[in-house]
């Protein structure tokens, strides 16, 4: 109960390794791209850089699907979205019919090998587009600085890793991690001042 059932792809009446087929792409993106935008209006300027990948697939597995695995029992955590959508003995029959993920199992325990096969159940689209860098600045007009010893001054605010557009919502898709156990790129904000004397 609560285990994954696989399709007999070759139709020989037995589900085994001969039913395995290629799925999706590799976890190394076939396409990596980036583009920038720059705009200036009067004393204001804006710079943005976007980066993304496409034709990339990764699979949910590891401690995301086996949080009780040997050696990890005291240090693993389970993603709340996965936990909320797994088959559980405490669920009602209706809840279990709607469960997206199989029951959680301990490594080496009943169902652990079956439920952790690479399949379309755990395959995820790894493509994303990210606003990697964004900066907005204001250059103080020279007419204001005329009577000072400052030749020019620009004030700016910038940020890194501000927005990510992706179908995958469990953790940062840029990590390429199968269990979310890698730190994502940090979101950083900076306020600065450039001055020439």
Write out the residue ranges for each language-model feature.
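Acidic carboxylate motifs that coordinate Ca2+ or other divalent cations, activating on Asp/Glu
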Residues: 8, 12, 16
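Membrane-embedded beta-strand positions in outer-membrane beta-barrel channels/transporters
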Residues: 34-36, 133-137, 190-192
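Extracytoplasmic gating/loop element in the C-terminal half of outer-membrane beta-barrel translocons
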Residues: 55-154
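Outer-envelope beta-barrel architecture signal
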Residues: 31, 42-44, 127, 149-153, ...
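C-terminal beta-signal and terminal closure region of outer-membrane beta-barrel proteins
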Residues: 70, 85, 89-92, 162-197
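Repeated loop/turn-to-beta-strand initiation elements of outer-membrane beta-barrel proteins
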Residues: 43-47, 143-144
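Membrane-embedded beta-strand positions of outer-membrane beta-barrel proteins
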Residues: 48, 155-157, 193
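Transmembrane beta-strands of outer-membrane beta-barrel pores
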Residues: 41-43, 52-56, 133, 140, ...
């Amino acid at each position: 109960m609560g285990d994954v059932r696989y399709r007999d792809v070759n139709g020989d009446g037995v589900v085994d390794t001969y039913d395995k087929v290629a799925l999706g792409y590799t976890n190394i993106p076939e396409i990596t791209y980036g583009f920038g935008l720059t705009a200036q209006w009067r004393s204001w300027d804006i710079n943005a850089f976007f980066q993304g990948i496409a034709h990339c697939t990764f699979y949910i597995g590891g401690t995301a699907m086996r949080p009780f695995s040997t050696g990890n029992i005291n240090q693993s955590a389970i993603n709340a979205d996965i936990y909320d959508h797994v088959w559980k003995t405490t669920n009602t029959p209706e809840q279990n019919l709607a469960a997206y993920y199989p029951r959680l199992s301990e490594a080496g325990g009943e169902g652990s090998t079956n439920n952790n096969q690479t399949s379309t159940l755990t395959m995820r689209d790894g493509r994303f587009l990210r606003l990697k860098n964004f900066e907005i600045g204001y250059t103080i007009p020279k007419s204001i600085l005329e009577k000072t010893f400052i030749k020019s001054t620009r004030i700016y605010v910038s940020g890194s890793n501000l927005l990510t557009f992706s179908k995958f919502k469990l953790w940062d898709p840029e990590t390429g991690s199968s269990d979310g156990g890698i730190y994502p790129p940090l979101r950083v904000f900076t306020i600065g001042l450039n001055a020439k004397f």
